[in-house]
């Protein structure tokens, strides 16, 4: 550089551009679906985990009904378990009836109300579970009669078949579908919270995205 040449002054705007890290592309929200039976304790724990996941990850969960009663219709099970399966028709029928009359947005709140009574409060009278849950969610008490009406079974079976056909009849609830792949579980107890729930979700997405995984 000769004495007559001036040192170039850096352009502040260029410096700013160089110092600003490249923005990461916005990722799309993942879509998940969980099939549950309110009577199933494992599905209850998995649903609590997915609720935590929704807080810490970009994911939208759709909630759908399946039925342990349908799954075990022809199974060779004990008398005590058969008695439970006979009772378990009630809650899922009521959820189907409520969703038909009031929309799918009532499925999750009704499940939450039923599950809290069955699994946390240990209420064994399912008619009571149904009546109290309908009142909590603000739905008509008359929906309770659906628990003992078979006219809702066709819709229940369709929802059940849609989930179970993705994983096979050798599994029960819960069934979780992610990005076109479905599998039993994951069953986690206790349900992880916060970032721990998010990390499990990350791992679930990883394995679900592996070709041939089931």
Language model segments and positions:
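C-terminal cap of thioredoxin/glutaredoxin-like
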Residues: 49-51, 127-214
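N-terminal acidic, proline/glycine-rich, low-complexity intrinsically disordered segments
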Residues: 1-14
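Short metal-coordination and nucleic-acid-contact micro-motifs, chiefly zinc-binding Cys/His arrays
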Residues: 28, 36
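Structural alpha/beta surface segment adjacent to cysteine/selenocysteine redox centers
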Residues: 35, 44-130, 203, 207
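Cys/His/Pro-rich metal-binding microdomains
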Residues: 41
């Amino acid at each position: 550089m000769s004495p007559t040449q001036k040192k170039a002054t850096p352009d502040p705007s260029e410096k700013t551009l160089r110092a600003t890290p490249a923005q990461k592309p916005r990722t799309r929200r993942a879509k998940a679906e969980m099939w549950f039976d309110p009577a199933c304790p494992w599905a209850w724990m998995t649903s609590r985990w997915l609720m935590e996941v929704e807080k810490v990850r970009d994911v939208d969960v759709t909630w759908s009904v399946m039925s342990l009663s349908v799954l075990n219709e022809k199974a060779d099970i004990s008398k005590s378990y058969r008695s439970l399966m006979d009772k378990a028709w009630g809650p899922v029928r009521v959820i189907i009836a409520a969703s038909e009359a009031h929309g799918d947005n009532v499925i999750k709140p009704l499940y939450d109300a039923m599950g809290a009574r069955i699994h946390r409060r240990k209420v064994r009278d399912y008619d009571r579970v149904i009546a109290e849950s309908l009142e909590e969610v603000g739905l008509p008490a008359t929906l309770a009669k659906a628990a003992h009406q078979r006219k809702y079974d066709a819709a229940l079976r369709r929802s059940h078949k849609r989930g179970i056909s993705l994983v096979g009849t050798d599994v029960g609830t819960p069934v979780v579908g992610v990005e076109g792949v479905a599998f039993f579980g994951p069953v986690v107890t206790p349900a992880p919270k916060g970032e721990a729930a998010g990390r499990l979700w990350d791992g679930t997405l990883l394995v679900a995205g592996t070709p041939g995984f089931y």
